[in-house]
UniProtKB/Swiss-Prot annotation:
Short sequence motif named Important for interaction with partner proteins, residue ranges: 168-173
Region span, Disordered: 113-173
DNA repair among keywords: yes
GO molecular function: single-stranded DNA binding
Source organism: Cereibacter sphaeroides (strain ATCC 17023 / DSM 158 / JCM 6121 / CCUG 31486 / LMG 2827 / NBRC 12203 / NCIMB 8253 / ATH 2.4.1.)
Name of the featured protein: Single-stranded DNA-binding protein
Function: Plays an important role in DNA replication, recombination and repair. Binds to ssDNA and to an array of partner proteins to recruit them to their sites of action during DNA metabolism.
Gene3D superfamilies on file: Nucleic acid-binding proteins (2.40.50.140)
Organism classification: Bacteria, Pseudomonadati, Pseudomonadota, Alphaproteobacteria, Rhodobacterales
Length: 173
């Protein structure tokens, strides 16, 4: 294999307010807990089921950390891109412990706030921790790959129509 890719993309909701920790050297890290849920209908009973996964996120990018600290709150919907990293540490009894988390570092990460203005949307850091930008609107994208709503898409193709609300349909296979 010529190379490998370590990229994580999550769209979910914060389970609590961001936790900010400062280092002695003046740097800081912002920790998030993001919930993603999947729903399905049990074939045997017809009952709707749901499973929620909790993801630990550590933001080391200074600009993205500032946006998260100022604007994100419990319940905020966010889109993040980062890398999966596992770190080793020792608990109070000296036992080795491992934590796997999504890490947002400078030049390799992204954070976009989704949802309405009441949730603080409209701010985001671009690729490479590129500061702070106003994305506007309650949803940033109409359809996958069609570009920002109300703006020019990256390609020459026109953007698609509105969202389809047929997520309750069963998969046809």
């Amino acid at each position: 294999m010529a190379g490998s890719v370590n990229k994580v993309i999550i769209i979910g909701n914060l389970g609590r307010d961001p936790e900010v920790r400062s280092f002695q050297n003046g740097g800081k890290v912002v920790n998030l807990r993001i919930a993603t849920s999947e729903q399905w209908r049990d074939r045997a009973s017809g009952e709707r089921k749901e499973r929620t996964e909790w993801h630990s996120v550590a933001i080391f990018d200074e600009n993205l950390a500032r946006v998260a600290e100022q604007y994100l709150r419990k319940g905020s919907t966010v889109y993040i891109e980062g890398q999966l990293e596992t770190r080793k540490w020792q608990d109070q009894s000296g036992q080795d412990r491992y934590s796997t988390e999504v890490v947002l570092r400078p030049f390799r990460s992204s954070l976009t706030m989704l949802g309405g203005r009441g949730e603080g949307a409209g701010a985001g850091g671009g690729m490479g921790g590129g500061g702070y930008e106003d994305r506007g609107g309650p949803d940033n994208y109409d359809n996958y790959g069609s570009g920002p709503r109300g703006g020019a898409s990256s390609g020459g193709a026109p953007s698609g129509g509105g969202r389809r609300n047929d997520l309750d349909d069963e998969i046809p296979f």
